[in-house]
Amino acid sequence: QRALLFDIGGGSTELAWVRLDGGVPTLMGFESLPMGVVTLAERFAHVAYSPFGFHAMVDDIVEKLLPFERIHRIAHEIRRGGVHLLGTSGTVTTLAGVVLGLSRYRRPLVDGIVLSGEDADQALRLLRDLGKDGLHRHPCVGPERADFVLPGCAVFAAIRSLWPAEHVVVADRGLREGMLLRMMRTTSPKPSRGGMSRE
């Protein structure tokens, strides 16, 4: 089994490509890219809320992810099966909150949840379609985080476009805070706790 771990931060996005054969995790590749929700929000501030601006962000991020894909051929491994996608960041926890239909963020419900790729993509589209005012009002976002949600969603969309794993494991903690242990314990996907929110 293999796992692609990603952490979308404020100023960077970290990727770790890990082999889990035999229960002992082996790091096969690691990359820290100088792009995060804050830096992307600054670069695309005037266009991030438009469809054109969002797709421009995604295209820009995909170009930066491609060297990692060319080296490790992760998409090929995903097609063969046995690859887990595990993410941590305000972006993926927000997507999980949307899928669960939470009226406020609750870490115990979000941490460790396994989302189907379809649910995660649908939650992303919902957030993208809300617009600035809708993101300000959404209980899982709020005014303090609204400007950073779509840049984070753009990173997630770029990751999903290159590496469309069947499920996404969500962790409310960093790459260095036990994610490998969580990944090793995730032997098979469990259904997400709840359906898509239609708020």
Model feature map: region roles:
Residues 11-14:
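Acidic, divalent-metal-coordinating active-site segment for phosphoryl/phosphodiester hydrolysis
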Residues 7:
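Conserved catalytic-loop position in the HRD/HxD motif
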Residues 1-3, 17-20, 24-199:
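Helical "lid/coupling" subdomains associated with nucleotide-phosphate turnover
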